[in-house]
C-alpha cells in the first residue's frame, strides 16, 4: 500500500511539472498570462511541501520494513529502485537523505547495482557532491563507494567529474576515509591514474600504495 501511494504521488508530481511547464511557455508568449502562471507556481510550491512530507514518511516506513530481507526482495520486484531513482530529483533534504540511504542499502547486491547502472544512479549521485547538508553528503559518498566496486560504475564516476570533487573533500576529516576509499577504487584502473595528475592529489596517489588495510575497512564498515 505504501509503495503504491509513493508511485501515485510520483506520477502526480510528473503531471504537475508538465502542466506548470505548459503554463510557463504560454506566459512567455503572452505576458498577460504571467500572473496566472505565478499563481499556479505558488500553488505548486505548497503542494510540493505537503507531498515531500508524505513521501518522507512513506520512504521511512519502507526503509524500516526493508530490514526484513524477504520484504526487501518483494519491494525490489515491485520496482522500488526505479521509484527511488525518480525521487533523487527532489529538493527536500530530509527526503533525499532517506532516498539515498535506501539506494545505498540496496546497492550491495550486484543485481540491484546493475539496475542502478542502467538508471544512471552514479551520475545522479555525483550531482549531489558536494552538498551543504553534511548528512546527505555522507550518505551519498557511501552510496558512491558501494557503486565503485563495479568497473563500469568507476568509469561513470570519472566521466561524471567526481575525481576533482572528491579531492576537494579529502581534507574534511569526517569524510576523508570514505573519499580515500573511493579514490583508491578509481586508481585501481590504470587508465584513470593520469587523471590524478591534474589535481592536488599526487601525494594521495602515492599513499594508496600502503593502503592494504582498506579491504578490511570495506568489509567491516561500509556494507
What are these regions (language model features)?
Residues 1-223:
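Long amphipathic alpha-helical tracts in eukaryotic proteins
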Amino acid at each position: 500500500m505504501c509503495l503504491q501511494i509513493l508511485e501515485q504521488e510520483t506520477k502526480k508530481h510528473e503531471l504537475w511539472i508538465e502542466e506548470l511547464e505548459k503554463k510557463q511557455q504560454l506566459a512567455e508568449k503572452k505576458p498577460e498570462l504571467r500572473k496566472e502562471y505565478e499563481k499556479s507556481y505558488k500553488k505548486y510550491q505548497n503542494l510540493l511541501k505537503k507531498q515531500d512530507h508524505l513521501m518522507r514518511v512513506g520512504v521511512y516506513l519502507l526503509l524500516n520494513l526493508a530490514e526484513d530481507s524477504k520484504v526487501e526482495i518483494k519491494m525490489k520486484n515491485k520496482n522500488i529502485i526505479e521509484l527511488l531513482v525518480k525521487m533523487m530529483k527532489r529538493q527536500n533534504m530530509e527526503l533525499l537523505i532517506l532516498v539515498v540511504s535506501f539506494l545505498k542499502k540496496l546497492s550491495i547486491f550486484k543485481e540491484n547495482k546493475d539496475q542502478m547502472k542502467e538508471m544512471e544512479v552514479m551520475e545522479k549521485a555525483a550531482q549531489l557532491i558536494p552538498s551543504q547538508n553534511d548528512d546527505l553528503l555522507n550518505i551519498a559518498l557511501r552510496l558512491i563507494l558501494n557503486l565503485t566496486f563495479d568497473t563500469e560504475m568507476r568509469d561513470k564516476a570519472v566521466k561524471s567529474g567526481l575525481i576533482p570533487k572528491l579531492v576537494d573533500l579529502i581534507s574534511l576529516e569526517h569524510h576523508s576515509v570514505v573519499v580515500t576509499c573511493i579514490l583508491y577504487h578509481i586508481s585501481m584502473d590504470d587508465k584513470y591514474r593520469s587523471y590524478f595528475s591534474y589535481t592536488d592529489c599526487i601525494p594521495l596517489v602515492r599513499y594508496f600504495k600502503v593502503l592494504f588495510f582498506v579491504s578490511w575497512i570495506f568489509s567491516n564498515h561500509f556494507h
